[in-house]
Amino acid sequence: MIKVISYQSKYKPDFKRLNLEWLDKYNLTESHDLEILDDPQGTVIDRGGCIFLAIEGERVVGTAGLWKENEKEYELIKMTVDPVYRGQGISKILLDRCLTEAGKLKAEKVFLFSNSQLQTALKLYGKYGFCNVEVTDAPFLTADVKMELSLALNQ
């Protein structure tokens, strides 16, 4: 049974391993990624964001988080599922949790940066109502997709 928990430092190696797996696979790893993966507490949580972990037993099988851009906007970050566990709806569980948390934080918008190679993820975001927008202010050189979801009407 999959449960979603808030980030705990004991799972830092799993958070890093799972994210580097997909970043390296698609040759997308950048210094900004490594800053977050090396210090999720300091770079995300202490700045007002959050990270969630999907757990089966004691095994971390997925991650996702919200990076606080400002009081009204959060970036969906580091969403991944262990390849062995893909296709089981874990991404949906993590995305639901992030969007619920964004609502609690009174976010008006959640946005994300991605890469056009990641078609499965992009389709999922589209199903949730994320819309493609012009790529601006991307923290990643490899980000060729930006999507946004307005939450303002849901509050």
Predicted regions and their residues:
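Conserved glycine-rich acetyl-CoA-binding loop
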Residues: R59, Y74, M79-D96, G103-L105, ...
